[in-house]
């Protein structure tokens, strides 16, 4: 029987084949009661805070800024080949061992400090916050020497794959012929892995500044020729496998310290429609009225990180991971851990002065009768950073079931390759040919070796490699983070208490009644 419906939409039918379901690692990874502690050495880095110092094309002093990311790629030992593991703990024919991250502490050395960055030729004209007069026609060059204290950011991202960043870059227009010289190009959001040494956001946004600011005068020196990245947390937290971020901690802090405007012709001027955005200037006013040349609306703020205090520190404290945010509950596939750090709360730049006619290694040779002159000294700038990484890992087992192997093969085929599963090779189809004198000119060129080498998927990227293959220990009580873990989990032995001797009076035995 026909009936009337108020809406006529599409009819959605279920798929003909079942949709693949992403398994959580808790469904096929079995935990053990075996834990290990791992710790890196003290990791130090020194460089120039604003740019690389080059000599003949070679970098003599690298750029080391507090506004850079530090991405540590920690290499873990293969638990299936680990000598400290009891062979009776698992069956190598039906199981494989993996590491699970349960605790981490990122140590940072040095005092807190508020740094300064800027540009000696910054495109700034006038004060638009509290102006005392209206600016007249601009000169050809209005650039000033301006410095700021950058936005204060602390960021920690932990995963078994590199963190993904995002920034705004140039985009190809649909019609290149329609884009004339001097016109604003289209822009697009671009993703890339965050590498060690990449610049972060310091209050001017995440963008490709060398391409988007061709005047080289709109941002400080340390990002004027760099790409500022920001972690794409929306994308990483929605990843079906959750390998890029097990967990993250983030704290941002800033306020607008000054309000200025940029100089230069406006590419898209305010529409000249009286009564909409403004009213026309009265022509009967004196000719020297500066408002006949309307000012620039390219407003911008200079950020400030404000107060820096140790009570808001994300580092130098342990993090215990009970549940990751994704389906991967902190299983370190590939025996790797990526730790991404951004921390400019220790933004101290050392200013080093060296007298020109004195050995730099013997500065005390300056005579006490010397009369100061600034021209007698060379000034240098250096930035230093200090890190230490500590981990607590739990040993886990993965069964070599067919459905689990199929799931891992879809997720990352390199996992099965690293496990070196002994598949039965097919029977030979026939007799093969083997030549002697392979390097002879009379013999054909031999075929290349078919056995593929282990290819590093991140060989094109720059990370701070930390080798922890020989840093594991099962004696957790010998390390600070290990003792904290034992105390948190209740595995630490209780304090031995002495027995107290109490004087007691013996009671007389009661006589038994006799009938």
UniProtKB/Swiss-Prot annotation:
Listed InterPro entries: Capsid_L1_Papillomavir, Capsid_L1_sf_Papillomavir, dsDNA_vir_gr_I_capsid
UniProt superkingdom: Viruses
UniProt main location, coarse: virion
A GO cellular-component term linked to this record: T=7 icosahedral viral capsid
Compartment(s) where it occurs, according to its Swiss-Prot or TrEMBL record: Virion; Host nucleus
Quaternary data: Self-assembles into homopentamers. The capsid has an icosahedral symmetry and consists of 72 capsomers, with each capsomer being a pentamer of L1. Interacts with the minor capsid protein L2; this interaction is necessary for viral genome encapsidation. Interacts with protein E2; this interaction enhances E2-dependent replication and transcription activation.
Protein's UniProt name: Major capsid protein L1
Origin species: Human papillomavirus type 50
């Amino acid at each position: 029987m026909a009936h009337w419906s108020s809406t006529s939409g599409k009819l959605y039918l279920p798929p003909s084949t079942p949709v693949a379901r992403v398994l959580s690692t808790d469904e096929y990874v079995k935990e053990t009661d075996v834990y290990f502690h791992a710790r890196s050495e003290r990791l130090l880095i020194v460089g120039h805070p604003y740019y690389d110092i080059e000599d003949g094309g070679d970098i003599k002093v690298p750029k080391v800024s507090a506004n850079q990311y530090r991405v540590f790629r920690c290499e873990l030992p293969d638990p299936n080949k680990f000598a400290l593991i009891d062979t009776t703990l698992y069956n190598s024919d039906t199981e494989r061992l993996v590491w699970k991250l349960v605790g981490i502490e990122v140590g940072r050395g040095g005092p807190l400090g508020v740094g300064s960055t800027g540009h000696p030729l910054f495109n700034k004209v006038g004060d638009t916050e509290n102006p005392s007069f209206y600016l007249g026609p601009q000169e050809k060059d209005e650039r000033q020497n301006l410095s700021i204290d950058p936005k204060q950011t602390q960021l920690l991202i932990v995963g078994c794959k590199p963190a993904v960043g995002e920034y705004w870059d140039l985009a190809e227009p649909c019609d290149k012929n329609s884009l004339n010289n001097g016109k604003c190009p289209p822009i697009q959001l671009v993703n890339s892995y965050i590498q060690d040494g990449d610049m972060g956001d310091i209050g001017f946004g995440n963008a490709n500044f060398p391409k988007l600011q061709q005047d080289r005068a709109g941002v400080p020196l340390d990002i004027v020729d760099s790409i500022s990245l920001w972690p794409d947390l929306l994308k990483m937290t929605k990843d079906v496998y959750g390998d890029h971020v097990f967990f993250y901690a983030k704290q941002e802090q800033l306020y607008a310290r000054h309000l200025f405007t940029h100089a230069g012709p406006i590419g898209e001027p305010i529409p000249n429609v009286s009564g909409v955005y403004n009213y026309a200037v009265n022509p009967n006013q004196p000719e020297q009225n500066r408002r006949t040349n309307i000012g620039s609306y390219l407003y911008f703020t200079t950020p400030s990180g404000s107060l820096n205090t140790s009570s808001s520190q994300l580092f130098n404290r342990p993090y215990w991971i009970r549940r990751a945010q994704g389906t991967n509950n902190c299983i370190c596939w590939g025996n790797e851990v990526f730790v991404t750090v951004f921390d400019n709360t220790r933004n101290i730049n050392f200013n080093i002065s060296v007298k020109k006619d004195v050995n730099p290694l013997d500065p005390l040779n300056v005579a006490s009768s010397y009369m100061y002159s600034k021209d007698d000294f060379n000034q240098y700038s250096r930035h230093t950073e200090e890190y230490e990484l500590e981990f607590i890992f739990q040993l886990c087992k993965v069964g070599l079931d067919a459905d689990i192997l199929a799931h891992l093969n879809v997720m990352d085929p390199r996992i099965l390759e690293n496990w070196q599963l002994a598949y039965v090779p097919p029977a030979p189809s026939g007799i093969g040919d083997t030549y002697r004198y392979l390097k002879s000119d009379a013999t054909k060129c031999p075929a290349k070796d078919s056995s593929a080498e282990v290819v590093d998927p991140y060989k094109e990227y720059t990370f701070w490699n930390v080798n922890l293959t020989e840093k594991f220990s099962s004696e957790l009580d010998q390390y600070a983070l290990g003792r904290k873990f034992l105390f948190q989990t209740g595995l630490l032995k209780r304090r031995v208490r002495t027995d107290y001797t109490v004087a007691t009076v013996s009671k007389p035995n009661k006589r038994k009644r006799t009938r």
